[in-house]
């Protein structure tokens, strides 16, 4: 029978000490490898290590940090202080307004609106002021402000309209100011969107929690899809997949599925939950017939040209200009800015000349995706490039290889609210996307986000806006000639999901955007003002509005 060789015999058979030392090292490595390969975690570790190397440059969400928490740095502390300061300012502007009965809240029917200092003749360029006195359902004058109002003047026959500026005196009275931009008969509209008591309730409910939306993540377990709960925060002691951006203090979580690596996250979807942070009494304020009720009773005027030849020559529209309120008006269905001179870009030749050798990055929600749907209808040489993927939320690319035009739309990252399944494989936050843009004089970035943030506490939106601002500042350090444009939110339809998607939330976010980006050399496309002027009450405005937005964009970059 053959005798087995022992390690001692093997060592003695080696010619010298160096050979014996090398043999021992190889033996130790072999033993370690055997132990590791028989352990239950080796497969997950290898997948994790391999994915970390391959995918790190593509997506921040492929960095799975088992134990690392978001740590404070001087930059993150400064950002959190800025978030807190903005939140405190907003809390002061929207104080609690408890109420006993619905009858004690603001009534559009009982409130009055009268023209302040009425004139016999109104001329183009004049200001029209309307004094609004808020009253409750008993006809008693309100002693505090805070009502959410939407003001507009319009002339249907001329397809003309513009928004009004509301000044709240915080005592139940409001001054609503309009600029008379066109001649002819003009009608007035002031809608009570929500009474101050409803505004207070929406603000409290918004900042109370994250439970109004349920996220579901789809992971790949081998070749089979498996589902689990996800969210911006999860109240559980179970093991979590943590998708953390440590620099920007952004976080998203999913419940860890047994045996499924966190890197196997492929898709996401969401739905509205049954959770509400409103009381039964507060919910009565948001029945459809209580929202967007007209205050004005048949107010109209006639505006004359008055031989007005004092129009000042306006500067050409350019990035960095301060946009007033209102930012412009519609006339014959076309948007006209109030503060700068526009080129019309009606001829396809002019549009092509503007876009030639341009790299255009559209970063944001589906209201920006409308741009990439509209452009090929006008510029026939722009063709879709199949970047694979499926569904409306995949990255869209348009190319004109002859004129060297590149246009890309990519959705923003969490939170993204939709019941349609969307891919997470190349998902990224806007600040990280900006960091990857080289930038030059032929590069333009358009950013728009907000609609998907409305269901969540306002600090989520504030933090994202600050992170976007910081990324733009970094971009300007390396490529100051790059053009950056911010498209604000637009108004949307009124539906039963007021607690989640009310335009009140959007109006607050618009104020925040203007505050955070006020000192940056960026262009502003005031989609809010445009959609009020057009009275486009749809989350996805019609093509006439999209055309006006793109027209403003072309004025900024050319």
From Swiss-Prot:
One short Pfam name that applies is: NXPE4_C
Gene3D superfamilies attached to this UniProt entry: Immunoglobulins
Q: What keywords tag this UniProt record?
A: Membrane, Transmembrane, Transmembrane helix
Q: What is its main location?
A: membrane
- Tell me which domain of life the UniProt entry assigns to the organism this sequence originates from: Eukaryota
Indicate where this protein resides in the cell: Membrane
Task: Specify whether Membrane is a keyword of the entry.
Answer: yes
The way it spans or sits in the membrane comes to: Single-pass membrane protein
The membrane spanning regions, by residue number, are 17-37
Listed GO CC annotations: membrane
Tell me the SUPFAM superfamilies matching this sequence.
E set domains
Q: Which family does it belong to?
A: Belongs to the NXPE family.
The protein's name? NXPE family member 2
The coding gene here is Nxpe2
């Amino acid at each position: 029978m053959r005798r087995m060789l022992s390690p001692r015999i093997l060592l003695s058979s080696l010619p010298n000490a160096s050979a014996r030392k090398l043999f021992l090292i190889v033996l130790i490595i072999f033993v370690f490898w055997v132990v590791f390969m028989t352990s239950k975690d080796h497969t997950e570790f290898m997948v994790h290590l391999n994915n970390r190397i391959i995918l790190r440059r593509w997506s921040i969400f492929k960095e799975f940090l088992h134990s690392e928490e978001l740590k404070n740095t001087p930059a993150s502390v400064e950002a959190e202080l800025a978030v807190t300061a903005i939140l405190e300012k907003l809390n002061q502007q929207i104080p609690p307004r408890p109420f006993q009965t619905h009858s004690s809240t603001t009534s559009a029917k009982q409130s009055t609106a009268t023209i302040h200092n009425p004139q016999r003749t109104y001329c183009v360029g004049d200001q029209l002021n309307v004094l609004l006195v808020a009253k409750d359902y008993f006809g008693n004058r309100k002693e505090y402000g805070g009502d959410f109002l939407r003001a507009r003047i319009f002339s249907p026959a001329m397809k003309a309209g513009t928004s009004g500026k509301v000044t709240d005196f915080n005592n139940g009275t409001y001054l609503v100011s309009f600029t008379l931009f066109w001649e002819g008969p003009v009608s007035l509209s002031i809608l009570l969107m929500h009474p101050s008591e409803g505004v207070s309730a929406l603000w409290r409910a918004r900042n109370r929690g994250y439970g109004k939306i349920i996220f579901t993540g789809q992971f790949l377990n081998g070749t089979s899809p498996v589902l689990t709960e996800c969210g911006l925060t999860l109240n559980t002691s179970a093991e979590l997949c943590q998708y953390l951006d440590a620099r920007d203090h952004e976080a998203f979580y999913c419940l860890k599925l047994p045996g499924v690596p966190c890197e196997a996250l492929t898709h996401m979807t969401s739905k509205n939950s049954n959770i509400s942070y409103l009381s039964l009494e507060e919910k009565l304020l948001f029945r459809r017939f209580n929202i967007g009720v007209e205050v004005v009773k048949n107010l109209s005027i006639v505006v004359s040209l008055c031989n007005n030849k004092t129009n000042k020559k306006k500067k050409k529209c350019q990035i960095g200009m301060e946009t007033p309120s209102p930012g412009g008006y519609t006339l014959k269905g076309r948007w006209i800015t109030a503060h700068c001179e526009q080129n019309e870009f009606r001829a396809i030749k002019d549009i092509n000349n503007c876009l030639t050798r341009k790299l255009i990055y559209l970063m944001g929600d589906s209201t920006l995706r409308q741009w990439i749907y509209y452009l090929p209808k006008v510029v026939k040489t722009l063709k879709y490039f199949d970047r694979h993927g499926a569904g409306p939320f995949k990255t869209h690319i348009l190319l004109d290889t002859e004129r060297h035009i590149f246009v890309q739309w990519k959705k923003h990252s969490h939170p993204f609210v939709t019941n349609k399944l969307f891919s997470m494989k190349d998902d990224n936050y806007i600040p990280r996307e900006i960091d990857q843009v080289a930038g030059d004089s032929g590069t333009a970035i358009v950013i728009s986000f907000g609609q998907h943030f409305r269901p969540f506490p306002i600090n989520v939106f504030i933090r994202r806006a600050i992170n976007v601002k910081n990324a733009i500042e970094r971009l300007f350090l390396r490529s100051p000639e790059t053009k950056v444009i911010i498209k604000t939110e637009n108004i949307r339809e009124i539906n039963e999901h007021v607690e989640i998607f009310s335009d009140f939330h959007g109006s607050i976010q618009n104020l925040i955007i203007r505050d955070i980006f006020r000192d940056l050399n960026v262009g502003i496309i005031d989609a809010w003002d445009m959609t009020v002027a057009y009275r486009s009450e749809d989350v996805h405005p019609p093509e006439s509005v999209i055309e006006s937005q793109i027209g403003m964009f072309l004025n900024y970059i050319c």
